[in-house]
């Protein structure tokens, strides 16, 4: 019988500074922590933490997702992050606060929400 190839072990990178990308939409919040060059180290979202449906859009779900991503990044030796926030969702501030509470030092907070120069037609207004 042929020998099975060994599974590659996940190597521990030792990265001290990085970038936390927070994408907060009306339905979900996704947090990706990368190194300065843009290679992802850890990521989490409100869905992966265990929330479904409309609960994903809450600030509490964003808080738990950010804590999980921060814990994974700190295992790789990360101490300081620059935060890039994108989108209009409810989890923006909660995610930033929980990154700080997890023990990561926030050096910069920047809003990188894309603003159209009158591009696509927006969704129609809701009539409730």
Curated annotation (Swiss-Prot):
One CC-aspect GO term: ribonucleoprotein complex
InterPro entries per UniProt: Ribosomal_uS11, Ribosomal_uS11_bac-type, Ribosomal_uS11_CS, Ribosomal_uS11_sf
SUPFAM superfamilies: Translational machinery components
GO BP annotations listed: translation
Molecular-function GO term, any one: rRNA binding
Record bears the keyword DNA repair: no
Record keyword rRNA-binding present: yes
NCBIfam families with a match to the protein in the record: PRK05309.1, uS11_bact
Function: Located on the platform of the 30S subunit, it bridges several disparate RNA helices of the 16S rRNA. Forms part of the Shine-Dalgarno cleft in the 70S ribosome.
HAMAP family, sorted: Ribosomal_uS11
Subunit text: Part of the 30S ribosomal subunit. Interacts with proteins S7 and S18. Binds to IF-3.
Name recorded for this polypeptide: Small ribosomal subunit protein uS11
């Amino acid at each position: 019988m042929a020998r099975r190839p060994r599974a590659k072990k996940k190597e521990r990178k030792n990265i001290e500074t990085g970038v936390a990308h927070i994408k907060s939409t009306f339905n979900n919040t996704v947090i990706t922590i990368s190194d300065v060059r843009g290679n992802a180290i850890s990521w989490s979202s409100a869905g992966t933490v265990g929330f479904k449906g409309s609960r994903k859009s809450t600030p509490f779900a964003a808080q738990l997702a950010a804590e999980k991503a921060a814990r994974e990044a700190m295992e790789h030796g990360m101490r300081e992050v620059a935060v890039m926030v994108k989108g209009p969702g409810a989890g923006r501030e909660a995610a930033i606060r929980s990154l700080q509470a997890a023990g990561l030092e926030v050096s910069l907070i920047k809003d990188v929400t894309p603003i159209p120069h009158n591009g696509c037609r927006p969704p129609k207004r809701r009539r409730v």
